Regions:
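Generic alpha-helical secondary structure signal
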Residues: 120, 135, 162-164
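A short beta-strand-loop micro-motif that forms or neighbors metal/cofactor-
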Residues: 130-157
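Short, surface-exposed linear segments at secondary-structure transitions and domain or protein termini
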Residues: 122-125, 165-169
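Short, Lys/Arg-enriched N-terminal segments with co-localized hydrophobic residues
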Residues: 1-6
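Residues that flank catalytic or metal-binding motifs in active/ligand-binding sites
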Residues: 85, 122, 139
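Non-catalytic, conserved peripheral segments adjacent to functional cores
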Residues: 7-115, 147-160, 166-169
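Conserved metal-binding segment of the jelly-roll/cupin
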Residues: 117-131
Length: 169
């Protein structure tokens, strides 16, 4: 019996708090009530994500990623997950980007993969264990990353061997 590979073309759709909720949280200030601080010269938006870094005595770290512009349509040949902690991507540039995700599991379920366009001035936080493709930038851009560092294997990579997945923006 010969198993045929499946070809799937995925088009990115607009992200919303609701359609992204099973993968993580949006990081924005549009629907939050800020706290006035610094004698009214600043507004503080608290508790924007569910940061998860403490498994196996891990700690939260902040990094900067410099991402290169991707070409579309693009082939998706792998996905990764971080089982021991969440991972937040906060753009430092006024540019939208794409995310490519699948629910938790032993491997990505090709029938449940989704892609979203993340608007300007919005970040995302992946829950621990969510399958995702590395950064997909529409332009060269910088990201502030809040991630986990510590003991244990916090990176699992899955390579698609037979299935062919194409992402269109």
């Amino acid at each position: 019996i010969r198993k045929f590979c499946e070809m799937k073309i995925i088009k990115a759709k607009k992200i919303t708090k609701k359609n992204f909720s099973k993968f993580g949280q949006l990081i924005d200030t549009s629907k939050k009530n800020p706290i006035n601080i610094n004698d009214g010269y600043a507004k503080r938006f608290d508790n924007l994500i569910n940061l998860d870094a403490s498994k196996n005595k891990g700690k939260a770290i902040v990094s900067i990623f410099k991402a290169k512009k991707r070409r579309f349509p693009m082939k998706i040949d792998m996905m990764e997950k971080h089982p021991l902690g969440s991972q937040a991507f906060i753009p430092m540039d006024d540019t939208k980007f794409l995310v490519f995700v699948a629910p938790r599991g032993n491997k990505p379920n090709i029938n449940k993969i989704q892609s979203f366009v993340v608007p300007k001035q919005t970040g995302i936080n992946y829950n621990a264990g969510i399958w995702h493709f590395p950064l997909i930038s529409m332009k060269n851009m910088n990201f502030l990353i809040v991630d986990r560092k510590g003991k244990g294997n916090n990176l699992v990579i899955y390579k698609f061997k037979k299935d062919k997945i194409i992402l269109k923006k």
